[in-house]
Amino acid sequence: MANGKRETEARWAGARWLIPVLVLVVIVGAFAWGLRTLTRATRDPGTAPTAADTSAGAPAGESSGTTVPPRVPDEWKGPHGRWHIGDWREVSFDDQQRLSAEQQAEIERLRSIGYLSGSEPVPLQSGVTIYDRSRTQDGLNFYTTGDVPGAILMDMEGHVHHKWAHGYIEAWTASPDRPELRPSPKGSGFWRRAYLFENGDVLAVFDGLAILKVDRNSRLLWVTFGGFHHDLDVMDDGTIYVLTREAHIVPSYNPDEPILEDFIAVLDGGGNEIARVSILDALANSEFAVLLNAAKPSGDIFHTNTVEMLDGRLEDKIPAFRAGNVLVTVRELDLIAVVDMDATRVVWGLTGSWKAPHQATILENGNMMLFDNRGNMGASQVIEFDPVNLEMVWTFKGDRPPDFRSRECGSNHRLPNDNTLIVESDRGRAFEVTPDGEIVWKYINPAQTGEELEYIASIFDVVRLPPSFPTDWSRRSRALDR
């Protein structure tokens, strides 16, 4: 008995050290889980929490998110990781005089970031391959393509009504305020995004280089140089909201390595900058600042790709969606956000299981639609959900995941007949689908690119113009009038 008792006491003494270790593991695990939950930010600050629905009917991302915006603890409001909120921009730093050769080289690399004109092999078919007249939305198609610095106006059968073309070097040469010309700048071979005015004028973005305006005959009206990229939105009074960026060192984010800092720039109708808001500042100054811990330490930290002015139709349900605030999509954080331009602050944000998303947009019915580039088992999908209750409304995935994929770019537009116009940029395709997911119109870009024309030219966006859109200035209309 004595020996047994001594053996039991020995075992107990040997195991005592395990108890504090197990307790410590539990505490660390709980803290890590709580921190992870905090970093998935959603909804408008001040709204009531809603239980995240993880059922099949919930939008992508609900299962990994909380509906309560993260509150930044007071102890985090000093330096934390790579960033801090207090004194965000007060560090003085002359990045032109104090940069090392390595830093200067990295800044030049970041400035040259851009998209390829094409990356997928040329398919066997091209042009309009599907056209169900009775079920498509009538109108002309205005689109930009990777093989030429220009845009095309085309009818539903693929007949070209008008073309615009104006090269970057041509615009650069004509401008007295031109910057130093970088060798073979990416983005100079095509218009990344374009906007068509009713008189035939076009606004166009050379990705990372410039924004310009040409008339219906492609004559240059004005050009503004800068890091303009991805997207623009034009107001009724001619004011332009456009994404821009700057490659530089932001000491309060990373004092050693350059970043690409994204901005929302506001231009007047002549291309003169009126204001700009840093998306980095807007996020750092907000309830969602903790998301910066998920950002890369340097380089293209955000890759913001969408800018859309809100019209206030959802303000009564989500105050952050008031008219004048701006909706953006931040690819590198898988984030949809609303920016208050006056307060320089993100006032609403949503992350989810979507991957590298593009073109979040508010629909006429108050829902939100998003091009999810890589969230469908590595393939793409378009999703529509209610931003108020986060319930899934509609998805398009194609018949099989490989059938629909665009790792980069992509766009989606809801049409008046309730069909959806989708652009699969990488594969140079655009198609119109019914609410049931049936393709009733498909266009495959006949243009090719690459040194040996081995790639189909990307289609960056297609806009279906309403039938009432005036086009009497187009070459086809003028030819028919003769």
Language-model features, listed with the residues they occupy:
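N-terminal intrinsically disordered, acidic low-complexity segments at the extreme N-terminus
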Residues: 1-4
